[in-house]
Structures are given as structure tokens and as C-alpha cells.
Amino acid sequence: MGKQLAIFISYLFHPLWMPLYVMLMFWNINAKAMFISNDVVWLYILLVVFINTLLIPVLLFWMMKRLKIIESLHLDSQKDRFYPFAIIGIFYLTTWYVFNSIEIFTYLSLVFVLAAILVFFALAINFFWKISIHSMSMGAMSTAVLYLAAVHFIDEVWPVYLIFILSGLVGYARLKLKAHSSSQVYIGYILGTLVVSIFFFTLL
């Protein structure tokens, strides 16, 4: 894998994209199971998620960079990660509140509770160690796909294979860019998997 491809993969599967990807996945394979079959409603959901979890946080990060609160938008250092992680967690909780207030979106709102838990977990770890949030988010996504496939009896197995292949590519890309050590990548993935597994287990 070349450096440019590793950079592209890292941007394409940046953790900030993950809530939007999860919503697209729900729209594609699980709409009827969540009693939301209207495409216009799904477009509203995607718009809210895009604004709350991607657009506004990115603009705030850019402002922090301009104000020299953080040194880099890549959040390479542990110091740079504190405020962005806290902001992301708050916006995830805000998105949860918006969706949870509408009855048919209650199931969807759990995604953002889980996302907030993961972010604050990463924030706590960041005080003493730099963990790969790319790997953590891919571990969370892998477990979520397995959960959906098992609980909602999804016949297609390709999403399961695909997410594990993508997880491997993302992890390798982070190592290729020397953004993390192998232990930071592996433990990030394991922690993402464990947190989501425990969360889903409490729902059963």
C-alpha cells in the first residue's frame, strides 16, 4: 500500500464519517425493521446527522486550529485531542436528544449514545495513552454489523465480510502512515469491539 492510498483510506474511514455511514447502512438494510420506510424521512435523518456530527464539529476544529487551540487538524498529539473529543461527544449526545424526542427514532438514537460512550472512553484513555480512534471506530462498526445481521436475520453475508476487510485496510493504513504503533491499532479495535458488544448485550 502506497502512502497516498493510506492517506485516502484514512480520510474515507475517518471516525467522523462513521455515524453517517451507520445511518446509510440502516437505510439500506434495516429500514423496515425500524419502522421507517419513507425515503424523505431518511433524508431528514441523514441531514441532521451530517450537520450535527460532521459539518459543525469540522468547522469548530478549523476555528480551534485558527485560534491555535490545537496544532493540527489531524489530532496527532494527545494534547490536540482533548477539546475535539469533548466536542464530538457533546454533539453525539445532542443528536441522541434530538432523535430520542421523536418516538419512531428511539432505536436510531441508541447509535449516538453508543458513539458518545466510545468517544468519552477514548478521551479518558487519551490522558495517559494515545489510542487509534480509527481502529476503535472500525471495531465498533464490525460489531454493529454482526449485531444487525444476527438480530434482524439479514441473509446477505457480504456486509460482514466487507466490514472486516475494510477494518484490516484501515488498520494497515494507520500503520503505514506511522500514525500509531501496532499495539495502539490492535487495542483500539479490541476496545471498540468490547464496548459495543457490552452495550448490545445490555439491550438483549
Where would I find each of the regions flagged by the language model?
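Juxtamembrane helix-capping/reentrant segments at transmembrane boundaries
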Residues: 9, 71-87
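The first (N-terminal) embedded transmembrane alpha-helix
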Residues: 10-30
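Short, Lys/Arg-rich, polar N-terminal cytosolic tail immediately upstream
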Residues: 1-6
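Membrane-embedded catalytic cores of phosphoryl/pyrophosphoryl-handling enzymes
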Residues: 105-204
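Alpha-helical transmembrane segments
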Residues: 40-55, 114
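Membrane-interface helix termini and inter-helical loops of multi-pass transporters
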Residues: 30-40, 69-73, 101-104, 204
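Transmembrane alpha-helical segments of multi-pass membrane transport proteins and ion-pumping complexes
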Residues: 15, 19-20, 53-62, 89-96, ...
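C-terminal halves and exits of single transmembrane alpha-helices
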Residues: 83-103, 125-127, 131
